[in-house]
């Protein structure tokens, strides 16, 4: 399934800034939602934009960020993917791009990396239980102000990638 569907999603996502934003939006809409409802949510957001009943709380901020920054994000993502960097360097750079999106933490940034680039993955509540991972290890300081806090976030991101 991964080799078939994820490759198709990657090709779609890497075709344009709008497609990439669609993929990130799908990831965001899946937060605290039944996966089977995400298609309906996508249709509603595409039709109603900010007036969609599925955009609430942080999802509004995320949508606004995506609409304002999708071209910049897409250019950055393509630059990373086309670079000669190692897998880990690319994965860290992509995670950094996605973690700038309002509303995305490590698991959903990892899901974006998985769907758009075939890297990292989504360590969601189901996988946390399956792999017996401490949920605290998936939390980042949302506004790190010191070099120590920034390094702690970077360290957690690198650990997440591994």
Annotate each PLM feature.
Residues 16-20, 30-34, 103, 119-122:
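Short, contiguous, pocket-lining structural segments
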Residues 2-11, 15-17, 82-86, 92:
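Catalytic phosphate/metal-binding cores of nucleic-acid and nucleotide-processing enzymes, i.e., regions
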Residues 33-102:
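Alpha-helical ds-nucleic-acid-binding substructure associated with the helix-hairpin-helix region
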Residues 88-138:
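Catalytic DNA-binding helix-loop module of base-excision-repair DNA glycosylases/AP lyases
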Residues 22-34, 63-68, 114, 162:
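Short, hydrophobic/amphipathic alpha-helical patches that form generic packing surfaces
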Residues 10-24, 30, 51-59, 159-162:
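Structural motif
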Residues 22-26, 49-50, 94, 109-113:
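Short, flexible active-site loops
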Residues 28-29, 140-162:
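A basic, often C-terminal nucleic-acid-binding module that engages the phosphate backbone, implemented
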